[in-house]
Amino acid sequence: MSPSFKSTAILGAVALAARVRAHGYVSGIVVDGAYHGGYIVDKYPYMPNPPDVVGWSTTATDLGFVAPDAFGDPDIICHRDGAPGAIHAKVNAGATIELQWNTWPESHHGPVIDYLANCNGDCSSVDKTSLKFFKISEAGLNDGSNAPGQWASDDLIANNNSWTVTIPKSIAPGNYVLRHEIIALHSAGNQNGAQNYPQCFNLEITSNGSDNPEGVLGTELYKADDPGILFNIYQPMDSYPIPGPALYTGGSSPSPNPPTSTQSPVPQPTQSPPSGSNPGNGNGDDDNDNGNETPSPSLPVEIPDDLTSRELLLVAQEIIARLLELQNQLVVSN
């Protein structure tokens, strides 16, 4: 390993540690041109009276993930301690929904998957453990010829951190939970290394359809040893087995949207947490990490001294992922 490679890797690792909390969340959704707010997890938990939104609340203020060893836990359903949103977004079957992430780190390559579950009543009071999800959209590996590959998550980033999903025309009308998820695979070559980021939203769907797909309980969607969960992206890949149940016949595997230069307004936090709280501002990195450029942080770089043990683990995983990518770049260049 050359000295320049070593120094680049070390500086990149330090920069990652300094920005360990940079993962994103869905700040809102757009339906027929109307914006509906999501749960702003780095703001609303610290407000005495947060607004009613369609997005489910969560206690994942560190913007962390659900690991494979928690796939049987209710946290996998709609993220950590997920609780239903208070209101519903109205949408016609056959229409598209744009989900707007506030950010997503380029190093966190992986699939984007969408599910629906019929609440059989008001979603604002539904028991999440009773929800049965059917997959309506999935997208995974686009090109695996050069590790770590081009993924659906890269399409999301290229489209201004947004993703579009179509509500199947054939499903019956009713209130549904939309479960949108990115699975980050940068550490998935190791047991318990995949990172699931589920986000949930309440929908009121109007439809002339009649299908009521059976679905799968959220705690049964994945297993820790599924081929698409335990998966090494740091090697040439011919294909990728997208995890979860089979795609609903009325669903789709979307083609990526072309990148756009504009997007609907995304609400930004305007209030800092109370003194003494430690919400963090993400767990990932925001470097250009597409295999063409390497990190070039300015010095000195301070590593936060208030990281939790979970965040320290994330730092280690991020460092390993970055080193593997840099090593792959060196091999390719030689």
From Swiss-Prot:
Biotech uses: Lignocellulose is the most abundant polymeric composite on Earth and is a recalcitrant but promising renewable substrate for industrial biotechnology applications. Together with cellobiose dehydrogenases (CDHs) an enzymatic system capable of oxidative cellulose cleavage is formed, which increases the efficiency of cellulases and put LPMOs at focus of biofuel research.
Gene3D superfamilies: 2.70.50.70
InterPro entries, per database record: AA9, AA9_LPMO
Keywords: Carbohydrate metabolism, Cellulose degradation, Copper, Disulfide bond, Glycoprotein, Metal-binding, Monooxygenase, Oxidoreductase, Polysaccharide degradation, Secreted, Signal
Cofactor note: Binds 1 copper ion per subunit.
Localisation per UniProt entry: Secreted
Gene Ontology annotations for the cellular component aspect, listed alphabetically: extracellular region
Low complexity bias: start-end ranges: 249-265
Catalytic activity: [(1->4)-beta-D-glucosyl]n+m + reduced acceptor + O2 = 4-dehydro-beta-D-glucosyl-[(1->4)-beta-D-glucosyl]n-1 + [(1->4)-beta-D-glucosyl]m + acceptor + H2O
Positions of the UniProt region annotated as Disordered: 244-304
Signal peptide: 1-22
Recorded superkingdom: Eukaryota
Cofactors, names only: Cu(2+)
Function: Lytic polysaccharide monooxygenase (LPMO) that depolymerizes crystalline and amorphous polysaccharides via the oxidation of scissile alpha- or beta-(1-4)-glycosidic bonds, yielding C1 or C4 oxidation products. Catalysis by LPMOs requires the reduction of the active-site copper from Cu(II) to Cu(I) by a reducing agent and H(2)O(2) or O(2) as a cosubstrate. Active on hemicelluloses, including xylan, glucomannan, and xyloglucan. Shows clear activity on cellooligosaccharides, generating C4 oxidation products.
Family assignment from sequence similarity: Belongs to the polysaccharide monooxygenase AA9 family.
Name assigned to this protein: AA9 family lytic polysaccharide monooxygenase A
Protein's organism: Malbranchea cinnamomea
